[in-house]
Amino acid sequence: MWHEARKHERKLRGMMVDYKKRAERRREYYEKIKKDPAQFLQVHGRACKVHLDSAVALAAESPVNMMPWQGDTNNMIDRFDVRAHLDHIPDYTPPLLTTISPEQESDERKCNYERYRGLVQNDFAGISEEQCLYQIYIDELYGGLQRPSEDEKKKLAEKKASIGYTYEDSTVAEVEKVTEKPEEEESPAEEESNSDEDEVIPDIDVEVDVDELNQEQVADLNKQATTYGMADGDFVRMLRKDKEEAEAIKHAKALEEEKAMYSGRRSRRQRREFREKRLRGRKISPPSYARRDSPTYDPYKRSPSESSSESRSRSRSPTPGREEKITFITSFGGSDEEAAAAAAAAAASGAATGKPPAPPQPGGPAPGRNASARRRSSTSSSSSSASRTSSSRSRSSSSSRSRRGGGYYRSGRHARSRSRSWSRSRSRSRRYSRSRSRGRRHSGGGSRDGHRYSRSPARRGGYGPRRRSRSRSRSGDRYRRGGRGPRHHSSSRSSWSLSPSRSRSLTRSRSPSLSRSRSLSRSRSQSHSPSPPREKLSRPAASPAVGEKLKKTEPAAGKETGAAKPKLTPQEKLKLRMQKALNRQFKADKKAAQEKMIQQEHERQEREDELRAMARKIRMKERERREKEREEWERQYSRQSRSPSPRYSREYSSSRRRSRSRSRSPHYRH
């Protein structure tokens, strides 16, 4: 049922479209053949009898029924004529004092212009009345001549003549010839030679082109018009007015035709072309959100460690300002000389980057280590609270020149320093991190970063660390272990990276206090026990200084994030929304284009595979056909020829069998 309804609806729609197209074609046809109605007006006169009966007609035309009119025997009329009762026709004598208003006078002059303008033009052109009447007669018989084309008009305009007519009794041999157009009035219309026929406006007679007349011709034309009841200067002024009106009507009609042309279902493309043509010369201004500049925000304060580490983590190459001189640790005792050297290195780095060195904090890391922490390639965990609300997994890839300087904590319990990002501790700040680092590390005590964890040396007697994180380190050189001296628990296990190392970390955080941040946290904390069982128990209280730092930075970071969100105006919100929509659309278009390219490539591959398979089939069929022909030929040849010796026939048959098996083997099929 639904299919029948759809079929009927399609049929009706097709009929409606056909009717519309037919109506448009009919309208175009009538517009094409439309002409001036005055051209179809014809007056025919012929002699006819008043009385159909011949006897009555003879009696009526006999001189007996004729009588002189008003006693004049030269003027005989029928006695049954009504004019016989007009005994006297008085002459009209206008009054001497006639009061005519200016409006009536102007109307009378306009009427005289409409009545006699054809005669004025004929008098100006020097054309007699007989020539005009004969031309009208020719036009009534054969119709008006076709309008000249544009090229002919230009040629004739150069010769100062539009269309030349030859009259039988024409004796006018002037250069100026006339163009003609039939009039609606009884007066004949003939024009001057330099007048151009108006093609579009049929209501206005063919006018003299007043723009091409000089002053003498204008004065002569006005003088000719004064004899027909017009004031001096009226004729040329009214001609100009008629020309302006004709141009206005022509323009309006062209606009109407253009609108009619670009209407309907079939001309959407034409309407679009017309719109593009109209907008081609117009300068289109960009939209408001694209015209305005980006809004500028007041700078807000951030912690120096956050800003510096964030800027460092985004750059993949070391900036020239941060390329520093590499210093090597020569003593591991945490002596005063080492602290002084670390402070000097921090001052040098601060002078290089234009920032003052950070003062050493009690209970925190040593000054040398604090200076080296600012040179690391990613955000430290103390500055990670700015991105505390992000819930996505972050990957940061950074390549920077990093090294670790300074000494370690001097621990009274002889515990080695461990990373705070312990993946299996049961504290609230648990993080699971995976890191993959590539590069060369030449270390004196084993390579280790913030995502590599090593057990205490109680289990291992040397410096080689055992990693509990899932990390793979590919290095051109093997890790060279240092000398195993006496049990020196405060010795350093730090390493230097002489080449920029790329590391990717996937950090998962389960606690709300520590965020998922784009960082390779390399901070270290003190542990209170070297043995693994004591480690797990003492892990929550392992780093009191870092915990205090985190507690202090949490509210500060909250304030910063609160202050870092300026209120957006509706225009800026709209701009952001528009930019997001544009980015989304651009990504969708790009994705669609890629999918289309992939699909086209897939189709091309399928076509190639099909062609290859068809070629393979054709070759196989050709090979089979050749083998059949060869077998037929061999069979016929063996019948016709004499049978050879048994030894020869045996060798021949074996060679044939061997060649046939080779040809049929799949290795030879392509």
From Swiss-Prot:
- GO CC field: nucleus
- Where does this protein have compositionally biased stretches of type Basic residues? 265-283, 411-443, 481-491, 655-670
Q: Name the residue ranges with Low complexity bias.
A: 340-355, 378-400, 492-529, 638-647
Q: Does the keyword Coiled coil apply?
A: yes
Regions crossing the membrane? none
**Does Ribosomal protein appear among the keywords?**
no
What family does the database annotate? Belongs to the splicing factor SR family.
Its protein name is: CLK4-associating serine/arginine rich protein
Origin organism of this chain?
Bos taurus (Bovine)
